[in-house]
Amino acid sequence: MKQYLDLLNRVLTEGTEKSDRTGTGTISVFGHQMRFNLDEGFPCLTTKKLHLKSIIYELLWFLQGDTNAKYLQEHGVRIWNEWADENGDLGHIYGYQWRSWPDYDGGFIDQISEAVETIKHNPDSRRIIVSAWNVADLKNMNLPPCHAFFQFYVADGRLSLQLYQRSADIFLGVPFNIASYALLLQMMAQVTGLKAGEFIHTLGDAHIYLNHLDQVKLQLSREPRALPQMKINPDVKSIYDFQFEDFELVNYDPHPHIAGIVAV
């Protein structure tokens, strides 16, 4: 995807070398935006192979409101293991905030359900926002949210989604984030009777870790291929009823996988 490769190039040419929480070191830029029109294909990176199984199961896990890594581990997904405690718990991370944001009356707000209902019944609202960045609850999260909040927008029968990501690990994390939120957009569009429009990805601190530079240069040497298509079971009508088997990525022909070490 040209949008992603342009981001890699920008960071390499314009970025500032910075220290970071993990001690690894990064090259970083502040503020970048990518746009993906889903009419042009599903934005799953082709310059290296992505592990789609992990992306799908993680999104379903978020939507269930689950915050324990055991569900992921049972399905062979290990991407959250580094931050889980001995019982698999991760604290009040994404799923908890999406589905059970605490209110001031002792109850909880299901932000996903509210977003679905607002898209259906008040599509011109400018308040269709889901936030994982709960300042009062950051201390209870094993990893504060990198992809912090997202907003939906309805126009001409099309549903679009914009994500703000405060911290973006461009080599390892961002390809997953692009595919995950594009998939969420398709799912939300289906259950609200709309067509999936555009996914807009806005990044805050966009960085390449110093131990990923060789992998990034290898990726930039590869020619992007045609985007695949994501087919979703049309019979699913609730955002909470999707199963792994309801998704099929067709015509995905990526270059080989490129390994990289996760900075913890």
Curated annotation (Swiss-Prot):
It is found in: Cytoplasm. (6R)-5,10-methylene-5,6,7,8-tetrahydrofolate binds at residues 51, 169, 263. Pathway: Pyrimidine metabolism; dTTP biosynthesis. GO terms for biological process: dTMP biosynthetic process; dTTP biosynthetic process; methylation. DUMP binds at residues 21, 126-127, 166-169, 177, 207-209. It comes from the Bacteria. The keyword Transferase applies. It catalyses: dUMP + (6R)-5,10-methylene-5,6,7,8-tetrahydrofolate = 7,8-dihydrofolate + dTMP. GO terms for molecular function: thymidylate synthase activity. The keyword Cytoplasm applies. GO terms for cellular component: cytosol. PANTHER family: THYMIDYLATE SYNTHASE (PTHR11548:SF9), THYMIDYLATE SYNTHASE 1 (PTHR11548). Homodimer. Catalyzes the reductive methylation of 2'-deoxyuridine-5'-monophosphate (dUMP) to 2'-deoxythymidine-5'-monophosphate (dTMP) while utilizing 5,10-methylenetetrahydrofolate (mTHF) as the methyl donor and reductant in the reaction, yielding dihydrofolate (DHF) as a by-product. This enzymatic reaction provides an intracellular de novo source of dTMP, an essential precursor for DNA biosynthesis. Belongs to the thymidylate synthase family. Bacterial-type ThyA subfamily. This is Thymidylate synthase. It comes from Bacteroides thetaiotaomicron (strain ATCC 29148 / DSM 2079 / JCM 5827 / CCUG 10774 / NCTC 10582 / VPI-5482 / E50).
